[in-house]
A protein has these predicted regions:
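Short loop segments and helix-boundary regions at transmembrane helix junctions
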Residues: 2-9, 62-66, 105-161, 187, ...
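Single transmembrane alpha-helix segments in multi-pass membrane proteins
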Residues: 38-88, 95, 104-120, 258-262
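Cytosolic-side transmembrane-helix boundaries in multi-pass membrane proteins
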Residues: 1-23, 181, 199-213, 284-331
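Hydrophobic alpha-helical transmembrane segments of polytopic membrane proteins
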Residues: 104-106, 250-278, 305-313
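Helix-loop-helix "hairpin" substructures at the membrane interface of multi-pass membrane proteins
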Residues: 165-241, 264-265
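Inter-helical junctions in multi-pass inner-membrane proteins, predominant
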Residues: 32-40, 185, 222-257, 289-290
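Membrane-interfacial amphipathic/re-entrant helices at transmembrane-helix boundaries
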Residues: 1-52, 80
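Transmembrane helix-bundle core of multi-pass membrane transporters
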Residues: 120, 131-187, 216, 289-299, ...
Length: 331
């Protein structure tokens, strides 16, 4: 059996699995009287922070920098996004503040890991731990309450109406960004340098290109997209901020990255899967006749269980850059 036959066989299996899954989901929707439009809208909302964060991290890791501090960046930028919206009296400017905050955090992470040669796992973990206390500090110092802050409805970034439901402008932007990231990485000189910095930084250095600058730029861009995802959660989705607003979304985004093998378009597809899985499970859990049987907290575990399964299956089958997570030292 040649390689082409194997690929065709795998595609047929994936197509069959997709058809079966679609049939099961359709049956459950009809059986429990769920709204397909509501599931669609909720799935896109849930998908957006995953997609933005995962696509940004794909670019980052292609350059050889691994940032596991996405959870902390999402939490902090969710707060700064709301603060920016109230400060400038504009939700879109709040999104910009969130993106800039995330970009700054990515830049600092780049300085620490690229120029400081710090262990990237430790640095990313530090961001996550730092965010736990810093988010509460921001909530208390800005609004005088450490747990929650509700945003005025007029400052929320409203979705646009389409024939298939309401869709956020940021969601559309996230889909476009995934395509642009693919073009950047595979169709431009900068993208070639980013990929080369992750595969063979010595060769890039010999060619006269600064590896440290390429990696820092990638880290900054990844942080900015993650920051936009954090601001999206508070300004476009939840209408406010709580101290646990990220709730593991940064780690799920990392699972999307692993599943995709650092490919932006596959990361977008993974984000769609995780987003719709969580919303679908929640919708079924609150349906009369089901919520009395299945504990609500058990259903809340579904996205995280699916994350563990996906990472376990995918991590051994994906190829990552040879210099991934390894600081480059010029000889």
């Amino acid at each position: 059996m040649n390689t082409l036959s194997v690929l065709k066989g795998k595609r047929a299996l994936w197509l069959l699995a997709a058809v079966v899954l679609t049939a099961i989901v359709t049956y459950i929707i009809e059986e429990f009287g769920l709204s397909a439009i509501s599931l669609f809208e909720g799935g896109l909302l849930s998908m957006t922070p995953y997609a933005l964060t995962a696509v940004g991290e794909c670019i980052n890791e292609k350059s050889g920098v691994v940032n596991i501090g996405l959870e902390g960046i999402l939490a902090i930028t969710a707060v700064t996004g709301v603060y920016g919206a109230e400060l400038f009296d504009n939700g879109f400017l709040g999104l910009l503040v969130g993106a800039l905050t995330g970009g700054f955090m990515g830049f600092v992470f780049g300085l620490v890991s690229v120029y400081g040669k710090a262990d990237q796992t430790v640095a990313g973990t530090g961001i996550n731990i730092f965010s736990i206390g810093f988010v509460q500090y921001l909530l208390m110092s800005i609004w005088g309450f450490p747990g929650i802050h509700i945003l005025e409805r007029r400052l929320m970034v409203r979705p646009i109406y389409t024939p298939i439901g309401q869709i956020s402008i940021v969601t559309i932007f996230a889909i476009i960004v995934a395509g642009l990231a693919h073009v950047l990485l595979y169709k431009t000189v900068l993208g070639f340098r980013i990929r080369a910095a992750g595969e063979s930084p010595q060769a890039v250095d010999v060619a006269g290109v600064r590896v440290d600058r390429i990696r820092t730029l990638s880290s900054t861009l990844g942080g900015a997209l993650c920051g936009l995802g954090g601001a999206f959660m508070s300004l476009c989705w939840m209408g406010g901020v709580v101290k646990e607003i990220s709730a593991g979304k940064g780690f799920i985004a990392l699972a999307c990255v692993v599943f995709a093998g650092l490919e932006p378009l596959l990361a977008l597809a993974a984000a769609l899967i995780f987003g719709f899985t969580g919303v679908f499970a929640f919708s079924v859990a609150v349906t009369p006749g089901v919520k009395e049987i299945i504990p609500f907290y058990f259903v809340n575990m579904v996205p995280y269980i699916s994350t563990l399964i996906v990472v376990t299956i995918a991590i051994g089958r994906r190829r990552f850059p040879k210099a991934s997570g390894v600081p480059y030292r010029r000889e």
